[in-house]
Amino acid sequence: MTRVLHLSDTHVSRTGPDEDGVDGVAALRQLLYDVRHIPALDLVVVSGDVADDGSREGCDVVRSLVGAFAAERGIPHIYSTGNHDRREGFAAALGFGHLGPDGAPIGRRTDLDGLLAGVSEVNGLRVITLDSLVPGETHGVLGRDQLDWLAAELATPAPAGSIVVLHHPPIFVDAIPYLESVVLQEPWALGDVLAGTDVRAVLCGHLHHQLSGSVGEKPVWVTPGVVTRIDLTAPSAHARGVLGAGATVVDLSGSPTFYTLHARDPRANTEVYVYDPLTGALS
C-alpha cells in the first residue's frame, strides 16, 4: 500500500499574510502539527498555489516546512505549479518540484521548454506532475505537447501504477456554473490520454474544497485548501472563504480511498470573504 498526504493551496507570500489577510505560514504549521500522528506515509504532495505572490521566498518557506515534515519520515515531497505561482520563483526554490527526503532533486523533468512538469517513482508508484499554469489567468491549460509527453511517460506501466498531480481539476460541476471558467480547460483531452493507462488517481487543488469526480474512467480528487476553504453554504452564485486548513490522506491499496483531515484551529469556519466569482465583487 502507498499512502500519500495531499496538500494544496498553501498561499504563502514573502511579506506575511496573503491578499485576504490570512497567515498561510501559521495555517501550514498548524496543519502539519495536527497530522503528525498519521502513520505509514510514503509521500507528501502539494498540488499548486504554493506561493500566493508567486515569489521564491514564499516557495522557500513551504519547502522548509513541508521538507522538514517529510525528512522526519524519510519520504519525498513533490510539488506542482498553480495559477498563483510564477515559474521562475517556483523553479528557484523547488526545481521542477520533485524532491527526495533530503531535499535533493529526484526523477526527471520534462524536456518541454519552460514547463515545470516531471516524473519520479516512489516505492514503485510513478508520480507525474503536470504544469497547468497560464500566467495571469485563473484557469488551467495543458497543451498538446504536454499531453503527448504524458502519453509517452504512461506508455509503459509502473510496478505500483501511477498518480497524476496538477493544480486545476479536470472536471465541471453543473451545480456550480462559475467553476467551468476556472478549472482545467478541455478536460476530455486529458481523459483521452489517461484512458487505458495504469493511472490510479488524479490529484488536484485550486478549489479550496474537497470534491470528487472523474475524468474519463479515472478518479479525480480535489483536496481542501491549507490557507482557507470554500464554504458551499454561501448565497447562490457567491463563494465564501473561511478559515480552517485541510488536507487529504490518499490510500492506494485496492480502490483508491480519500479521507480529509482538518487542522484543530479554534477559529475554523470564521468568514474571510464572500464574493461573486464571475465579477470579483466583494459582498
Where are these regions (language model features)?
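N-terminal active-site segment of His-dependent metallophosphoesterases
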Residues: 1-61, 67, 173
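His/acidic metal-ligating clusters that form di-metal
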Residues: 31-43, 139-221, 248-249, 256-258, ...
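Extended active-site neighborhood of metal-dependent phosphoesterases/phosphodiesterases
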Residues: 56-149, 189, 193-195, 216, ...
